[in-house]
């Protein structure tokens, strides 16, 4: 399964990073960071309308290289100027061609919150996200225990961050809710085989109480898709490949927000 492979390579990368910089040193780096003055992500999600999380992504396990020309800073700035509410940055290198320095540079250059899009399996990675400018992390229910879901979210909040707790099945939505998640992501992509079912998020939306913001992820391609998700009561959409392949990124974000 692809997800198992992703977790395996993440463990190897984590061990390498821990050898390069200890957790104690990383905590010191985080402690010295200036206060974040970007808009609060959770507060923004609770405002009316459908919010857009625009993703900076060069490749994926299912599609391989999505774009060969990858001016990541220019892309992120275009998202920001187009009115994206947050920017997701892939930092997983082996399957997504991501890198932490993309996150750090983008976080320094945009006015909106940034999300570290990676496979968080250890508290070290949360401190690492913070040190590189992220104010949002992703917690994937399928790869974490109930205790980890709760502990990692609470650590993120202690550091002034938010966590999107991502689910794919009804059982995972239940676990996300039981963990105390304050933002839930419903993925249309099965991370075990990377197949996409757009209707997955529509089917599971009703499980989440209206007081908890919900993000629809993956397989969102058209304005009709966006309208369906808005009508279903989603608070936000995360769009990656569709934006990355578009030559009119600003116009596409503006159109999605307008039609929603």
From Swiss-Prot:
Catalytic activity annotation: 1-(2-carboxyphenylamino)-1-deoxy-D-ribulose 5-phosphate + H(+) = (1S,2R)-1-C-(indol-3-yl)glycerol 3-phosphate + CO2 + H2O
Family named by the database record: Belongs to the TrpC family.
EC number: 4.1.1.48
Pfam families (alphabetical): IGPS (PF00218)
Source organism: Lacticaseibacillus paracasei (strain ATCC 334 / BCRC 17002 / CCUG 31169 / CIP 107868 / KCTC 3260 / NRRL B-441)
Example GO BP: L-tryptophan biosynthetic process
This protein's UniProt keywords: Amino-acid biosynthesis, Aromatic amino acid biosynthesis, Decarboxylase, Lyase, Tryptophan biosynthesis
GO function term, MF aspect, one: indole-3-glycerol-phosphate synthase activity
Protein's name according to its UniProt entry: Indole-3-glycerol phosphate synthase
